[in-house]
Amino acid sequence: MTTTTNQTTTSGNAVKWYISGPISGYEIEERRKAFEKVEQLVKRVHGTNDVFNPIKNGLPEDAAYSDHMMRDLEALVESDIVIVMAGWQHSRGCLNELKFARRLNLQIIGENEVVNDELDKYITSHPLKPYLS
């Protein structure tokens, strides 16, 4: 779906975000913090609570990898924008999510683009003042 600047789809529904980032092979607490940071960034910058965080997919941590992927892909189908975390190119799960997202014609952005959005908002709301000596 195409999105508009006010964070609604062209059909008027709220934009749904999906976070794609590597999980397997990392300490789960480190990943939990990294995903939480991206989730909070999207919520703050884009004023939404509609962010799917795979770390919080409702399954037990020790559930089978395939069960986690199925749950995550179900959420991906319902999403409009995928935000990709660093390290995606080395993650089988991320690569599968991104291939699927492409097939669904979802917008895919890197987490740095959200940081740039936040910076743009800050600069706009806090104009530079002339330096007075």
Name what the model sees in each region.
Residues 1-133:
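Conserved catalytic or regulatory cores that recognize and/or transform ribose-phosphate-containing ligands
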